[in-house]
C-alpha cells in the first residue's frame, strides 16, 4: 500500500502536556491511526494501523463480555414512531438525530433515523423474545456505528458525528435487585477492561440532571487527559422499568402473573482508543500497551556487508519462532538507516524492539529496547520468548502505574467554596469536595465555582461544601468532555 502521508523524522509533534490538541492531531496522522480528510465533518477513515489497534482493543473487550453475554447485531435504521415512543429518552437526542427521508426519489411515508443509540432499535424485539421467567436474565451486546449530529467543535475519536466503535450492552432481568447486581457487574467489567489498557479512571454516580435520558441513574467512568480535561470513557445505566413499560416487555412469573422486566445498559466508544493514545503517548509518538499494539515486537537487523546474510537469516528465523509463540511481530528488512527505523517504530508505539547485529549473533544474543522507558537489555536468543513475555507484562504494569500516579496527582481537595474557586483559578484537573447530592445545591455550586459537577463517589462522608448537610464525596472539574 502506498503511504498517503509522508513521514518526516524531523517533524515536530508538539509538546503533549502543553500543546495537547496539536500533539494529538499530529500523532493520529503520523502514526496512521485515522485519516481525517474524509469530506464529511466529524467522520473519519480508520487506516490499517489504527484499525489493528481498534481490533485488538475490541478483542480484549469481547473476551471479557463473552463470558456471560451474547453478541448480536441490530439494524441501523429506526422508524420515527418507535424513536418517539420514549419521550424523555428522545428529548436527550432529538437535536442530534440524522434522518432518512427518501428511498431513491420517493419520499418515505415515515422517516427513518440513523440510530443515535439502540434502545428504541432493540427493545421492540426484546418484547417479542421475552416470554417466561425461565428466559431471564438475558445479556446481549453489539459493536456498531452510531450517528449524532454533533453541533459542538468536533475532535477526532473524541467528539464525532459517526461513532464507529460503539459497544453497547443491554440486559433484561426479572427483579430490581437483579438489575442492581448487573450494574455492579458492569462496573467490574469496565474496571477489568480499563485496567488491561492501563487507563486510570474515576467512577462516579452522575448528578440527576446529567444522567442518561430515561434511566433511574447513571454510573460513569472518566479519565484525565493531558490537557487537564476529563473525558467520559464509559457509562452504566440502570433503566428500571421505564423502557419495559414503553415497549411492553413483560414476562410470566412462576405464579402465572405477567410483570414488566427490569433493564440495564452500558456502553463505550472510540474514546477508549483516544484515551490509550493520549495518556500513554509522549513526544516521540504512541506508546501502546502490548495487548493493543498492532505489532508487539519489531525486529531490526543491524547490517554490515561482512555478515549481512547471516544476520538476515537469524532475524527471519527469530520472526518465525516468535510468530509460532503467538507474538505479533514484524521484521523491518527495508534498506534504510537503522536510526530511521527506530524513529518510525517508536512513533508507532511498538512496545519492544529487538536488534540483531554481527556481534550479537556471535554471542547468540539480541538487544531488546523498551518503548515505555527506553531501557535496553541484552538477552540470549535461546529462550528469548519468555524474556519478551515478562517484559510485556512489566510494560503494561509500568504504563498503568504512571498513568494512575499522574491522575491522582491532579485531584485536589477543597473544604470551602472559596478554596474550590481558588483551585479553579490556579490549577487544572479535578477538585474533590463534599456535596449533598441535591440538584438545587449542585446547581448553586456550579454557578459559584464556575465548574461542572462530575458526580458523586460513594466512599467518604462529611458535610456539603455549600449547604452544610451530610454528604458523600463529590467531584468537580473546570472542563469535562461528556
Swiss-Prot record:
Residues binding ATP: 148, 150, 232, 235, 269
Cite the GO molecular-function annotations of the record.
ATP binding; metal ion binding; proline-tRNA ligase activity
Q: Which PROSITE patterns does this chain map to?
A: AA_TRNA_LIGASE_II
Q: What is its EC number?
A: 6.1.1.15
Transmembrane parts of this sequence: none
Q: Where is this region: Interaction with tRNA?
A: 346-376
Top-rank taxon, per record: Archaea
Q: Know anything about its domains from the record?
A: Consists of three domains: the N-terminal catalytic domain, the anticodon-binding domain and the C-terminal extension. The C-terminal extension binds a zinc ion, which probably plays a non-essential structural role in stabilizing the fold of C-terminal domain.
Q: How does it assemble?
A: Homodimer. The dimer is functionally asymmetric: only one of the two active sites at a time is able to form prolyl-adenylate, and only one tRNA molecule binds per dimer. Interacts with LeuRS, which enhances tRNA(Pro) aminoacylation.
Q: Which is a GO BP term held by this UniProt record?
A: prolyl-tRNA aminoacylation
Task of the protein: Catalyzes the attachment of proline to tRNA(Pro) in a two-step reaction: proline is first activated by ATP to form Pro-AMP and then transferred to the acceptor end of tRNA(Pro). Can inadvertently accommodate and process cysteine.
Annotated binding of Zn(2+), by residue: 436, 441, 464, 467
**Enzyme kind, highest EC tier:** ligase
Q: GO CC annotation: what is one?
A: aminoacyl-tRNA synthetase multienzyme complex
Family classification: Belongs to the class-II aminoacyl-tRNA synthetase family. ProS type 3 subfamily.
> Which cell locations does it reside in?
Cytoplasm
Reaction it catalyzes: tRNA(Pro) + L-proline + ATP = L-prolyl-tRNA(Pro) + AMP + diphosphate
Provenance organism: Methanothermobacter thermautotrophicus (strain ATCC 29096 / DSM 1053 / JCM 10044 / NBRC 100330 / Delta H)
| Pfam families tied to this protein | HGTP_anticodon, ProRS-C_1, tRNA-synt_2b
* Protein name as it appears in the record: Proline--tRNA ligase
Arranged from A to Z, the UniProt key words for this protein are: Aminoacyl-tRNA synthetase, ATP-binding, Cytoplasm, Ligase, Metal-binding, Nucleotide-binding, Protein biosynthesis, Zinc
Residues the entry annotates as binding L-proline: 117, 119, 148, 237
Amino acid at each position: 500500500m502506498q503511504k498517503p502521508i509522508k513521514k518526516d523524522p524531523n517533524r515536530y509533534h508538539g509538546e503533549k502536556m502543553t500543546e495537547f490538541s496539536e500533539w494529538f492531531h499530529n500523532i493520529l496522522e503520523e502514526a496512521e491511526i485515522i485519516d481525517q480528510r474524509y469530506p464529511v465533518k466529524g467522520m473519519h477513515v480508520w487506516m490499517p494501523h489504527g484499525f489493528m489497534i481498534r481490533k485488538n482493543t475490541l478483542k480484549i473487550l469481547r473476551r471479557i463480555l463473552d463470558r456471560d453475554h451474547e453478541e448480536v447485531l441490530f439494524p441501523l435504521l429506526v422508524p420515527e414512531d418507535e424513536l418517539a415512543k420514549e419521550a424523555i429518552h428522545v428529548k436527550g437526542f432529538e437535536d442530534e438525530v440524522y434522518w432518512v427521508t427518501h428511498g431513491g426519489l420517493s419520499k418515505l411515508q415515515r422517516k427513518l433515523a440513523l440510530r443515535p443509540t439502540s434502545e428504541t432499535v432493540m427493545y421492540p424485539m426484546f418484547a417479542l423474545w421475552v416470554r417466561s421467567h425461565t428466559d431471564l436474565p438475558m445479556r446481549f451486546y453489539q459493536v456498531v456505528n452510531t450517528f449524532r449530529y454533533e453541533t459542538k467543535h468536533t475532535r477526532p475519536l473524541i467528539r464525532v458525528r459517526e461513532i464507529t466503535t460503539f459497544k453497547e450492552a443491554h440486559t433484561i432481568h426479572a427483579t430490581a435487585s437483579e438489575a442492581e447486581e448487573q450494574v455492579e457487574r458492569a462496573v467490574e467489567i469496565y474496571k477489568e477492561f480499563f485496567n488491561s489498557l492501563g487507563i486510570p479512571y474515576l467512577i462516579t454516580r452522575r448528578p440527576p440532571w446529567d444522567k442518561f435520558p430515561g434511566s433511574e441513574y447513571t454510573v460513569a467512568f472518566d479519565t484525565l487527559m493531558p490537557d487537564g480535561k476529563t473525558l467520559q470513557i464509559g457509562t452504566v445505566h440502570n433503566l428500571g422499568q421505564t423502557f419495559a413499560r414503553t415497549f411492553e416487555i413483560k414476562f410470566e412469573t412462576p405464579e402465572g402473573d405477567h410483570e414488566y422486566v427490569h433493564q440495564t445498559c452500558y456502553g463505550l466508544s472510540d474514546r477508549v482508543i483516544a484515551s490509550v493514545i493520549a495518556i500513554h503517548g509522549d513526544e516521540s509518538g504512541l506508546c501502546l500497551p502490548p495487548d493493543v499494539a498492532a505489532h508487539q515486537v519489531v525486529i531490526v537487523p543491524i547490517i554490515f556487508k561482512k555478515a549481512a546474510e547471516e544476520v538476515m537469516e537469524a532475524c527471519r528465523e527469530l520472526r518465525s519462532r516468535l510468530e509460532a509463540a503467538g507474538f505479533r511481530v514484524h521484521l523491518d528488512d527495508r534498506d534504510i538507516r537503522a536510526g530511521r527505523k527506530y524513529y518510525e517504530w517508536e512513533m508507532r508505539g511498538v512496545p519492544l524492539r529487538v536488534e540483531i547485529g554481527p556481534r550479537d549473533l556471535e554471542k547468540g544474543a539480541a538487544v531488546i529496547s523498551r518503548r515505555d522507558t527506553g531501557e535496553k537489555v541484552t538477552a540470549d536468543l535461546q529462550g528469548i520468548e519468555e524474556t519478551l513475555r515478562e517484559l510485556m507484562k512489566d510494560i503494561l504494569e509500568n504504563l498503568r502505574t504512571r498513568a494512575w500516579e499522574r491522575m491522582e496527582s491532579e485531584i485536589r481537595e477543597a473544604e470551602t467554596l472559596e478554596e474550590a474557586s481558588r483551585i479553579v483559578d490556579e490549577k487544572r484537573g479535578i477538585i474533590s469536595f463534599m456535596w449533598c447530592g441535591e440538584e438545587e445545591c449542585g446547581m448553586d455550586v456550579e454557578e459559584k465555582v464556575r465548574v461542572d459537577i462530575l458526580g458523586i463517589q460513594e466512599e467518604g462522608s462529611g458535610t456539603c461544601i455549600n449547604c452544610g448537610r451530610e454528604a458523600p464525596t463529590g467531584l468537580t472539574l473546570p472542563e469535562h468532555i461528556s
